[in-house]
Regions:
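Solenoid-repeat scaffolds in large eukaryotic assemblies
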Residues: 2-3, 14-15, 42, 59
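Extended acidic/polar alpha-helical scaffold segments
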Residues: 22-134
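Long, low-complexity, highly charged intrinsically disordered regions
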Residues: 1-8, 130-133
């Protein structure tokens, strides 16, 4: 009920607060029960929150369940949903790029630190593959 009221009010701070406080276990139920008129607004919220927030998995779960439950309606109105779906895709792409950069940075930092502790650190699967070991 709080989510629907926040969507009706359409106030950004209220929407953000309600969106972030929804328990993850309730997302599938709320996504299935979300009325069609609020779907586009909810997808816009996901795009905005994913771009501005560190709660990446929360956005992924919302998007997954909304798309699974409302795919027929979205497919029938492809043209009207195209901009918001592009915005969601763009937000996830930016997060994915940032996450990939962080992973590469950590990988190289560990590679730099690991030789200084020879014998203390077991070689990683990646290092064994690079050396041709199994």
């Amino acid at each position: 009920d709080a989510l629907l009221m926040a969507l009706r009010l359409n106030e950004a701070p209220v929407l953000r607060a309600v969106y972030q406080r929804v328990p993850v276990a309730e997302i599938p139920l709320l996504a299935a029960a979300l009325p069609e008129p609020y779907l586009k607004r909810m997808l816009q919220l996901i795009a905005a929150q994913t771009a501005d927030s560190p709660h990446f998995e929360l956005g992924l779960r919302w998007a997954e369940h909304l798309l699974l439950n409302h795919h027929d309606g979205i497919a029938q109105a492809r043209a009207s949903y195209a901009p918001v779906l592009r915005a969601v895709h763009q937000a996830f792409s930016v997060q994915m790029t940032d996450l990939a950069k962080l992973c590469h940075s950590n990988h190289y930092a560990l590679a730099f630190l690991a030789p200084s502790h020879v014998g203390l650190v077991e070689p990683t699967a990646m290092a064994r593959v690079e050396k041709g070991e199994k």
